[in-house]
Amino acid sequence: MEFDFAELPAQDRYRLLVSFVAPRPIALVTTVDAHGCNNAAPMSFFNVFSQEPPLVILGMQTRPDGTVKDTVANIKRSGEFVVHMVDMSIAQEMIVTGINFPSDIDEIEFAGLTSVPSVKVTPPRIKEAPCAMECRVAQTIDYERRTIVLGEVVQMHVRDECLDERGRYVRPEVYQPIARLHADNYIVADRQFVLKKPTDLLHHEEAAGYGERKPEKLPG
């Protein structure tokens, strides 16, 4: 099948994109409004973008009436936000924060989660999350119905048991983030497998200037 996106209705473009670009990690984003009220919202148009500089990217759509959502307004006003990864321990709470509450409702508190102070930004982080990344805005890109935010990670919090004793490697049996497939369908990252490049072809990388590749020692 072929699809000309110039001729395709927006809803059909959305359906195709999110159904095939999947699973997508969930970012539970916290911000603060001008009155000091906390806001939390989940989004699946999200990913890590770079490690140097350390960037994450968020894509946030307007409300059906075209007005800007609280998360976007708060980020543009303050230039700060916190991204939390989501696992099964806070999956139901994450869904609750996705309800379109009035702006004066603290979704963190309403969902039964605990807000604790961040280190380098004003918005709080969620204590129960397995991982939290404090971010400052690096760039925003505005479209008619969507805002793209690039955020630089300035501080990262990780639940102790998610890492090995050296704090270097993720323990996959412990950290199992959930991701969105499409509609109300989600998946858990609880199955991993190894795929390695053929060793007899690695000389091509050395010839291209990558140098000799030494296998990284894994924990255990």
Stretches with model-predicted labels:
Residues M1-G220:
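Basic, polyanion-binding surface patches
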